[in-house]
Amino acid sequence: MTSSTFSAPIENRYFEDYKAGSVHEFGELTVTQDEIIAFAKEFDPQLFHTDPEAAKETIYGGLIASGWHTSGMMMRLYSDHYLSKNASLGSPGVDALRWLKPVRAGDRLSIRVTISETRRSTSKPDRGLVHSFIEVLNQDRQVVMSMKAVNFLLCRQNL
Protein backbone atom coordinates (compact mmCIF):
# COMPACT_ATOMS: atom_id res chain seq x y z
CA MET A 1 0.00 0.00 0.00
CA THR A 2 1.52 3.31 -1.05
CA SER A 3 0.71 6.63 0.49
CA SER A 4 -1.01 9.24 -1.68
CA THR A 5 -0.60 12.97 -1.55
CA PHE A 6 -3.37 15.51 -1.76
CA SER A 7 -3.53 17.82 -4.77
CA ALA A 8 -4.18 20.80 -2.49
CA PRO A 9 -2.69 21.95 0.82
CA ILE A 10 -4.79 21.46 3.95
CA GLU A 11 -5.65 25.19 4.00
CA ASN A 12 -7.22 24.97 0.52
CA ARG A 13 -8.62 21.44 0.45
CA TYR A 14 -12.22 20.72 -0.60
CA PHE A 15 -14.42 17.70 -1.21
CA GLU A 16 -13.01 17.26 -4.73
CA ASP A 17 -9.49 16.75 -3.32
CA TYR A 18 -10.48 13.61 -1.39
CA LYS A 19 -10.20 10.67 -3.83
CA ALA A 20 -11.73 7.23 -3.24
CA GLY A 21 -9.03 4.57 -3.05
CA SER A 22 -6.29 6.94 -1.91
CA VAL A 23 -4.26 6.18 1.21
CA HIS A 24 -2.71 8.90 3.35
CA GLU A 25 -0.24 8.49 6.23
CA PHE A 26 0.42 11.26 8.70
CA GLY A 27 1.98 12.38 11.85
CA GLU A 28 3.92 11.16 14.70
CA LEU A 29 2.90 11.73 18.25
CA THR A 30 4.82 10.32 21.21
CA VAL A 31 2.74 9.05 24.13
CA THR A 32 3.98 9.98 27.61
CA GLN A 33 3.28 8.38 30.97
CA ASP A 34 2.23 11.72 32.44
CA GLU A 35 -0.36 12.24 29.68
CA ILE A 36 -1.70 8.69 30.07
CA ILE A 37 -2.19 9.17 33.81
CA ALA A 38 -3.60 12.71 33.57
CA PHE A 39 -6.16 11.74 30.93
CA ALA A 40 -7.20 8.61 32.80
CA LYS A 41 -7.54 10.35 36.17
CA GLU A 42 -9.90 12.81 34.52
CA PHE A 43 -11.88 10.55 32.17
CA ASP A 44 -11.16 6.81 32.58
CA PRO A 45 -9.92 6.15 36.14
CA GLN A 46 -9.08 2.46 35.93
CA LEU A 47 -5.91 1.30 37.69
CA PHE A 48 -4.20 0.05 34.52
CA HIS A 49 -4.46 3.65 33.22
CA THR A 50 -3.68 5.57 36.43
CA ASP A 51 -1.27 3.58 38.60
CA PRO A 52 1.97 2.25 37.06
CA GLU A 53 2.64 -0.09 40.00
CA ALA A 54 -0.86 -1.55 40.21
CA ALA A 55 -0.92 -1.86 36.40
CA LYS A 56 1.98 -4.34 36.59
CA GLU A 57 -0.37 -6.82 38.26
CA THR A 58 -3.05 -6.61 35.54
CA ILE A 59 -3.43 -8.60 32.33
CA TYR A 60 -1.57 -5.76 30.57
CA GLY A 61 1.57 -6.09 32.69
CA GLY A 62 1.96 -2.33 32.91
CA LEU A 63 0.43 1.06 32.36
CA ILE A 64 -1.62 1.50 29.17
CA ALA A 65 -3.43 4.47 27.65
CA SER A 66 -7.19 4.60 27.76
CA GLY A 67 -8.78 3.77 24.43
CA TRP A 68 -10.52 7.13 24.64
CA HIS A 69 -7.14 8.81 25.04
CA THR A 70 -5.89 6.93 21.98
CA SER A 71 -8.98 8.13 20.12
CA GLY A 72 -8.21 11.70 21.15
CA MET A 73 -4.62 11.42 19.94
CA MET A 74 -5.91 10.02 16.64
CA MET A 75 -8.23 13.01 16.33
CA ARG A 76 -5.33 15.40 16.89
CA LEU A 77 -3.36 13.82 14.02
CA TYR A 78 -6.48 13.59 11.84
CA SER A 79 -7.34 17.24 12.42
CA ASP A 80 -3.78 18.51 11.98
CA HIS A 81 -3.01 16.61 8.77
CA TYR A 82 -6.14 15.29 7.06
CA LEU A 83 -9.24 17.42 7.65
CA SER A 84 -9.61 20.51 5.53
CA LYS A 85 -8.99 23.73 7.47
CA ASN A 86 -11.58 25.64 5.43
CA ALA A 87 -14.16 23.12 4.15
CA SER A 88 -14.71 20.60 6.95
CA LEU A 89 -18.30 20.63 8.17
CA GLY A 90 -18.03 17.97 10.85
CA SER A 91 -19.09 14.34 11.00
CA PRO A 92 -22.34 12.50 11.65
CA GLY A 93 -20.39 9.86 13.56
CA VAL A 94 -18.05 6.89 13.43
CA ASP A 95 -18.55 3.14 13.17
CA ALA A 96 -16.58 0.02 14.05
CA LEU A 97 -14.27 1.68 16.59
CA ARG A 98 -11.75 -0.95 17.74
CA TRP A 99 -8.87 -0.79 20.20
CA LEU A 100 -6.69 -3.64 18.98
CA LYS A 101 -3.46 -3.39 20.98
CA PRO A 102 -2.44 -1.56 24.14
CA VAL A 103 -0.79 1.84 23.75
CA ARG A 104 2.05 2.45 26.19
CA ALA A 105 4.25 5.32 27.28
CA GLY A 106 6.97 5.87 24.70
CA ASP A 107 4.88 4.60 21.79
CA ARG A 108 5.02 6.78 18.69
CA LEU A 109 1.67 6.93 16.93
CA SER A 110 0.79 7.83 13.37
CA ILE A 111 -2.36 7.42 11.31
CA ARG A 112 -3.20 5.82 7.99
CA VAL A 113 -6.41 7.01 6.33
CA THR A 114 -7.89 5.07 3.42
CA ILE A 115 -10.66 6.88 1.59
CA SER A 116 -13.23 4.22 0.78
CA GLU A 117 -15.98 6.30 -0.84
CA THR A 118 -16.82 9.85 -1.82
CA ARG A 119 -20.16 11.17 -3.02
CA ARG A 120 -21.79 14.49 -3.56
CA SER A 121 -24.82 15.17 -1.39
CA THR A 122 -28.08 15.11 -3.33
CA SER A 123 -30.00 17.09 -0.72
CA LYS A 124 -27.26 19.70 -0.15
CA PRO A 125 -25.24 19.99 -3.38
CA ASP A 126 -22.75 22.46 -1.88
CA ARG A 127 -21.13 19.57 0.02
CA GLY A 128 -19.97 16.00 -0.25
CA LEU A 129 -19.45 13.02 2.03
CA VAL A 130 -16.09 11.32 2.44
CA HIS A 131 -16.06 7.83 3.97
CA SER A 132 -12.69 6.80 5.45
CA PHE A 133 -11.12 3.88 7.26
CA ILE A 134 -8.69 5.19 9.87
CA GLU A 135 -5.92 3.14 11.45
CA VAL A 136 -3.65 4.25 14.28
CA LEU A 137 -0.22 2.65 14.04
CA ASN A 138 2.56 2.39 16.60
CA GLN A 139 6.27 2.70 15.86
CA ASP A 140 6.37 -1.00 14.86
CA ARG A 141 3.62 -0.38 12.26
CA GLN A 142 1.16 -2.43 14.32
CA VAL A 143 -2.43 -1.24 14.14
CA VAL A 144 -3.46 -0.29 17.67
CA MET A 145 -6.83 1.26 16.82
CA SER A 146 -9.15 1.44 13.84
CA MET A 147 -12.49 2.99 12.94
CA LYS A 148 -14.68 4.08 10.05
CA ALA A 149 -15.54 7.76 9.76
CA VAL A 150 -17.68 9.98 7.57
CA ASN A 151 -16.95 13.67 7.06
CA PHE A 152 -18.95 16.41 5.38
CA LEU A 153 -16.87 18.78 3.24
CA LEU A 154 -17.76 21.84 1.19
CA CYS A 155 -17.36 21.53 -2.57
CA ARG A 156 -14.96 23.86 -4.36
CA GLN A 157 -17.28 24.07 -7.38
CA ASN A 158 -19.90 26.02 -5.43
CA LEU A 159 -17.61 28.85 -4.33
Regions found by a protein language model. Give the residues of each.
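Short beta-strand or tight-loop elements
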Residues: 92-95, 111
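Hot-dog-fold acyl-thioester-processing enzymes
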Residues: 2-93, 158-159
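HotDog/MaoC-like acyl-thioester-processing domains
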Residues: 1-20, 99-159
